[in-house]
C-alpha cells in the first residue's frame, strides 16, 4: 500500500474530530496537495539526504526538469538532464560531489521526476 493510501485510510478511520484535525495538520505541514482526480500527492519528493543536504524534486515545476539541493550554506538547483547548475550558490567541492552523485543517480532522478508530474504541469515527463 502506498503512503498516500495509508494516510487516506487513517483519516477515513478517525473516530474523533481531534484525530481528523491532527491528520489535517500533518497534511498541511507535510507539503501535500490533491490531483485533479482527487488523489493525494506530495508537493515535494525527497530524493535523498546526504550529510545534512536534502535533494528534492517538486511536483508542479517550471522548465527545465531539475532537482533542488538544500542544506547548510547550499540552496541550488541543477538540471536533471546534464546537472548544469541552474540557480543558487554552491561551493566548488560540493558542486563536484553533486555532479558525481548525479552521474550515479540520474536514472532514479528521472524516475522520480516522471512519477511526480501532475496532469497540468507545464513540464512533462522526461523521455529517455
Label each PLM-derived region with a short phrase.
Residues 1-65, 69-128:
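Metal-centered catalytic cores of metalloenzymes
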Amino acid at each position: 500500500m502506498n503512503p498516500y493510501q495509508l494516510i487516506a485510510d487513517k483519516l477515513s478511520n478517525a473516530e474523533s474530530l481531534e484525530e481528523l484535525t491532527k491528520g489535517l495538520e500533518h497534511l498541511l505541514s507535510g507539503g501535500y496537495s490533491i490531483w485533479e482526480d482527487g488523489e493525494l500527492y506530495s508537493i515535494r519528493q525527497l530524493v535523498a539526504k546526504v550529510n545534512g543536504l536534502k535533494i528534492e524534486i517538486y511536483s508542479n515545476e517550471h522548465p527545465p526538469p531539475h532537482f533542488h539541493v538544500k542544506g547548510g550554506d547550499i540552496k541550488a538547483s541543477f538540471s536533471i538532464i546534464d546537472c548544469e547548475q541552474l540557480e543558487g550558490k554552491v561551493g566548488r567541492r560540493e558542486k563536484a560531489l553533486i555532479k558525481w552523485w548525479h552521474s550515479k543517480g540520474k536514472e532514479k532522478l528521472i524516475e522520480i521526476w516522471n512519477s511526480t508530474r501532475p496532469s497540468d504541469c507545464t513540464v512533462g515527463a522526461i523521455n529517455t
